[in-house]
Structure formats: C-alpha cells, structure tokens
Amino acid sequence: MIPFIPSSFGDIVAVANIAHSIYQALRDSTGSSFEYQCLIDELSSFKDAVGCVDRVLKATPLNESDRQAIQAEITRCHELLRKFWGRIEKYEVVISSSKWHTSIWRKVTWAILKTNEVANFRQKLLQHKSNIIVFLNAVTM
C-alpha cells in the first residue's frame, strides 16, 4: 500500500470521505446492536470534526509547526480509516448487490470484526477526534 502523505489541506477531505463511507455502509444496515450504533455515532462525530478542521484551516493561516502537527494527525487518521475500511469494504460491495443485504451486512461485519476490534477502532477514533479538537482550539485561540 502506498503511504498517505498529506500534501495539502484538501487531503483532510479524503479522510472525511473515508469516514463517511464507513459511516454510510454501517448506517445502511438495520437492526444494529448498541455497540454498532455507538460506532456509527462516533464516525459521524469524527467526520464532523474533520470537516470543521477543513473549514477552519481554509480561513486561518498557520505556522509551519502547527501545519506539520495537523498533517501528521491527518495521516494517522487516514491510516486508521483505510485499514478499517479495507476490512469491511469487500463485504459491503458483495452484500449490497442483493435485496437481502441489510440484515446480512450487519451479521457479516460483526462476524469479521468482532466486538473487541470494533471497540478498539472506536477508542482510536475517539483519540484522533480529541487530538483534532485540541488542534482546532490551538489554532483558533
């Protein structure tokens, strides 16, 4: 896999798009368990935070240190999301091509990911979102 190197703040949009793809794929399944719904909510919140970063950075000049810190965090977010998306994407495409996909999609995803993996992903996503909020606070003060 080619490493993701953010060359501009437009790359933030790529991270938001992956988060949205995962969110959309999970949201489209019905009858999800509590943990599953929490992950969906966390992805939505993360996507909103990344979108906020994009808007703030377009309007706020940054020094090189802040720019590098934000780029490093965006790179880490991108890696996390790509790995998770890579685990579920192939199943989403196959399952969504038929009419019975909604309940099967959830079952297959949980069978593949297991509750611990989803909880671990949620925790990492929450940490990245917290880091993003810290960066936002720092550049807007």
Sequence positions of predicted segments:
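N-terminal amphipathic alpha-helical segments
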Residues: 1-73, 84-95, 99-102, 106, ...
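Elongated alpha-helical scaffolds
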Residues: 72-89, 117-120, 124
